[in-house]
Amino acid sequence: MASSGGGNTGAGGTSGLGLGLGLSLGMGEATGDAEEEAAAAEAVGRLATSLWLRLRGWEAVLAAAQRLLVWEKPLHSLVTAATLNGLFWLLSSSSLRPFFLLSISLLTYFLLDLWHPRFLPDVSAPPPEEPHSDSEGAGSGAQPHLLSVPELCRYLAESWLTFQIHLQELLQYKRQNPAQFCARGCAACAVLAVLGHYVPGVMISYIVLLSILLWPLVVYHELIQRMYTRLEPLLMQLDYSMKAEADALHHKHDKRKRQGKSAPPAGDEPLAETESESEAELAGFSPVVDVKKTALALAITDSELSDEEASILESGGFSVSRATTPQLTDVSEDLDQQSLPSEPEEALNRELGEGEETELASPEDLLSAPPALSKQALDTEEEGAADKEALLQLSSPLHFVNTHFNGAGSPQDGVKCPPGAPVKTLSPEAVSGDLMAPSSTLSPQLCLAESGPVTPLSPSVLPSLPQDSPQPLAAPEEEEALTTEDFELLDQGELEQLNAELGLGPEMPPKPPDVLPPPPLGADSHSLVQSDQEAHAEVEP
């Protein structure tokens, strides 16, 4: 037991030692990285300070050069660029050698450095010990939007140190992998040799000079970002259209391939095309949607409402939304307006309602008969109720009177009406459906109802017009007369003559037994009938 416990203790101690060693190594690496960063920052600071001490006398010249390079004054920058281009092509077309030009340039630099204190005295302030921040360098005379001398020195120092680091890595790679380094070096030199064979060296030098002159302008005004912002929608649209065309071509190619595979042999009859039963074939008609492409396509579309949708939305006609179906809001109002009756209909209904209230009294008041009635009297009362219902149906403005075209409204059961009897049907103007017809064209009963209180009428006077009852067949002579003289308006004399010719003389209808005779019509009733006849005469053409 003790030995096993000692073994476990030893294993636990080993694992703890490994964990501690790993932590110490990690901490050591972090400490080493921090020390390297601190050393690099210190080296950048020392190099920037040394450069600033050398360039502090050229501060005004550097600021003017920056203004020319960023085209702060376009006219001055244009003149400078034209001068440099002319000088370059003049030197390139001369017979002087490049080494001679390089030696002349170095001689000019040394002479300027030697004669600088005499011709360009130092008028700048005494330098501080070390510019540690950008705010200290901002007050050195440069513009806020341009680089000051300390900032320029710091950028130059960082660039130089970065170049040194890459050079050290390249030398280390050469020592570790000499064969790969030789192969890559030979490939790079071959590319440069081919480029120099097809492109002259003067052109390459001119491209380098233009890059040096135009690069500050591009960086300062952010021309690349602006150009990319303007071209991004066009590029996305082009990419999306090319993707759609490629998908369409691929789909057509697959369809032709499937048709070629499913083509019948040479001797067989061609089969009719049927629906695809394979899920793979059906999937070809519904391509997979790329989320990124869809998002880019939606980004270039206009999310605002069109002019037509905006006008409809402002007028309140539709409730327009992008993700819903447009809903009508005026249809309900139109239906409500259609359901409301018009003013002529309301006036006519009001007049007819008042006439019905006056005319349609109780059967007891109309008949004024004793309480004990005979069987025939009860039948007469039932006929009066039927006549009242028929009158209610005829009083509706939308009711169609089928007896108007069935023989000029002849009475039923062979009962003949005398010429002087009141008309028992509505006039043609009232039946024609014209709601604007005057009330004088209605039947005499309706005119009596509108004129005020009337004397009670017996059921025999009320019209007996069943709605759907068939009319008796007329004689052959009567059918010929109706066929030849259909829809012809006649005056009272012609009507009496026609009735006499047809054998419809003035005969009184048979009176039922044990029934009181109807009261004679008064002067008011005859005058109303006469006025109705005069109205018919005025309507005649």
UniProtKB/Swiss-Prot annotation:
Residues 507-521 have a biased composition (Pro residues). The modification Phosphothreonine is found at T274, T329. The keyword Phosphoprotein applies. Residues 270-280, 476-494 have a biased composition (Acidic residues). Residues 453-475 have a biased composition (Low complexity). A motif (LIR motif) lies at residues 485-490. One of its GO terms (cellular component) is endoplasmic reticulum membrane. Residues 249-282, 331-369, 403-541 are annotated as: Disordered. Residues 250-260 have a biased composition (Basic residues). It is a multi-pass membrane protein. InterPro entries: ER_autophagy_membrane_reg, RETR2_RHD. Keywords: Autophagy, Endoplasmic reticulum, Membrane, Phosphoprotein, Transmembrane, Transmembrane helix. Belongs to the RETREG family. The LIR motif interacts with ATG8 family proteins. Endoplasmic reticulum (ER)-anchored autophagy regulator which exists in an inactive state under basal conditions but is activated following cellular stress. When activated, induces ER fragmentation and mediates ER delivery into lysosomes through sequestration into autophagosomes via interaction with ATG8 family proteins. Required for collagen quality control in a LIR motif-independent manner. This is Reticulophagy regulator 2. The lineage of its organism: Eukaryota, Metazoa, Chordata, Craniata, Vertebrata.
